């Protein structure tokens, strides 16, 4: 059997199974997002495969299926709306009678109570016609402190010696700068501050604005001695706490790691593990007191804002991608480092090779390197 025939057969099989699966109900109190700090992108992905219904794959930023997502299609010509609920595989099955161009919106509950997910208001229009059968939409957390999910600007800078130092330790000031760069311009403006609450963060320090802004936003805290210790290496626990404060929720559940029971950052670490942002090691440990490396910071930040590049994502613009001599393409962090250090335009691609097992994997496909990105080195 030819490879293309196998793929068609596999996709047809999963669609038939998915149509029979029950859908998960959205909580009664779920409401659409009211701020524009979330993202949804709908892109044609599989051509020439004819199936009985249009299929919209709904995915959370953590790459998990958005089971129970409520999808609203608004006809751009008539204004009429229809709603569809994604099944446990994250598949919303849409009748083929709905021909036209639609604005797509989706909402769902997250894996932790109190966290809602939504697509970006005014997402890329979805065109339903005889040629398109399979599309996708990505949902992100609705946060009070908005992150820039849409613009894939570089947020990490290399060193003067030409290296990026993926295995080097990263300081508290440096991760504050990274989180500052990942904020939307509106968020940075809302929390803008240069008034330091810390004795060791001077007005002339290169990181003053970043640290003061994050402090005002409630993402960072200092030490009992009144200092921030900006040049100290940040631990995995400390960085987890900074990120988890974005979600403004507490999580009391099963401990995810062997070595975090009773740790001061246990709740923060569990939140990030539940959301797929923090990964443990092969022994089931989070290593909370270990210094964070630059590669680990890049990987966590990419998961935080839903950036999902692989080694082949940037193939179409490989000649213009900035590489690093110490970022080997065989390293586990290779794509994460390139994602963090290259500003780029992109589309989404979906991998349906493992669709029968419910493993729809959404990855980026870079289209060009951006030249309009902020210059964080200034």
State what each model feature region is.
Residues 6-15, 20:
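Sec-dependent N-terminal signal peptides
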Residues 17-30, 43, 127-173, 180-208, ...:
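Feature responds to low-complexity, polar/acidic, surface-exposed segments characteristic
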Residues 28-54:
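Beta-strand-rich domain onsets/edges
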Residues 47-70:
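Structural motif
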Residues 77-91:
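Short, acidic Ser/Thr/Gly-rich low-complexity loop/linker segments typical of extracellular
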Residues 89-105:
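Short Pro-Gly-centered beta-turn/loop motif in secreted/extracellular proteins
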Residues 92, 124-126:
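Short strand-edge motifs at loop-to-beta-strand transitions and within beta-strands
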Residues 105-123:
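A short, solvent-exposed loop/turn motif at the edges and junctions
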